[in-house]
Amino acid sequence: MNEELLTVDEVADILRTTPNTIYRWLRAGKLPGVKIGKEWRIRRETLELKLSETNTVIIKDQSLLDNIHPQHDHVMAVTRNTNNLYNLEAEFFKKGLSRGSRLFKGCWWQHPDDVRQELSLRGLPIEELEGKNSLTIVDLTHQYNRSGKNGPIQIWSDEARKTLELGYKTMWGSGSPHLLSCGGHFPNLVDFESSLEDVIRKLPVVGICPYIFETIKDDCFSQLINLMNHHRSVIFYNDGLATYLKNEPA
């Protein structure tokens, strides 16, 4: 049986990105392809499998995201793996776009180019959004290493201000730190989240902080509770099941 091979341009059209991005993914091995002479080809079956792994509807009850305040919120999300985390971020950003908001993505352990790829595979036109300044992606670890907690917090504030200057009313942003993102010390992370909560409550920002907890036991349980106390609500998400809890931070 003959396999259908797609050109780079065809794949770029399907994923709503540019051919240069597809070439970059192919060279990095992030998208499987075959070389025919000097030209790349991607098997349709391979592309469909990749899309089926990442472009699923992750929240069965879409009204769950409607619980997030459309203009001011600071939400913690608890996930089990990177695939769930990217799924949740993608749906969060789609909800923000549907409400006419500007998007902000802060990277801690994630590489910005990986974020672009993963969100593109989940149906977001990343290059188009970045080209219009409707989305900005920033390396927050670099900002933290340079300026401590004030670096990432200042980025959140600056992007919120820029959002208003561009004519938007609200910025929807996602951070997704790791438990050891802030210099390898959990207390530093708690201090950062507490300070971010103080700043976000004064800005037209809907912020979500997705975390990965592969297991919740012993120290992880106390860390989870500690972080929850610095967010106004919490989403628990795992493989298509999600629960939203309203929280009153301590």
Residue ranges and their predicted role:
Residues 2-5, 9-30, 34, 38-48, ...:
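Non-catalytic regulatory/interaction regions at protein termini and inter-domain linkers
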